[in-house]
Regions:
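Conserved acidic/glycine
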Residues: 48-144
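Glycine-rich ThDP/TPP pyrophosphate-binding loop and its adjacent helix/strand module
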Residues: 1-85
Length: 144
């Protein structure tokens, strides 16, 4: 199965590459796109969904990657991490959406714990993705 996680506002080239690869793959393909919607309560407004997607990727909330099994046939690592190391503030990203910001008003004592856990989980995912992307760069010795 070909799998990609994309965000149009974050990297249009990565999105187009993923769609092209997904279409070319001779089997099922799954492309998961980050799509801000009105229920997110983007404080900048719905006219800023592309910018919000970029913020999600820059903060490490959403990671961009592609998994193309065809690369394995070429002796290459099938997993490609397209996201850079997160550089923006994770909590600042969360607070830019009403769905998260409202939690600080309704359950302030729990909100901070949940935000910290969400950030830790996102960082763990990124580290796992980095490890997967590095796997193909290490030569593997064939057993005799």
């Amino acid at each position: 199965v070909y799998v990609a996680q994309v965000g149009m506002g974050a990297d249009k080239n990565q999105l187009m590459k993923a769609l092209k690869e997904a279409e070319a793959y001779k089997g099922p393909s799954l492309v998961i796109a980050y799509a801000p919607c009105i229920a997110h309560g983007i404080q900048a407004g719905m006219g800023k969904t592309q910018e919000q997607t970029k913020k999600a990727v820059d903060a490490g909330y959403w990671h961009l990657y592609r998994y193309n099994p065809d690369l394995e046939l070429e002796g290459k690592n099938p997993f490609i991490l397209d996201s850079k190391e997160p550089k923006a503030d994770f909590k600042e990203y969360l607070m830019s959406e009403v769905r998260y910001a409202s939690l600080t008003k309704t359950f302030p004592e729990v909100a901070e714990q949940l935000f910290e856990k969400a950030e830790m989980d996102a960082k763990k995912r990124y580290e796992i993705y980095k490890q997967l992307a590095e796997m193909g760069k290490q030569p593997v010795k064939a057993e005799a």
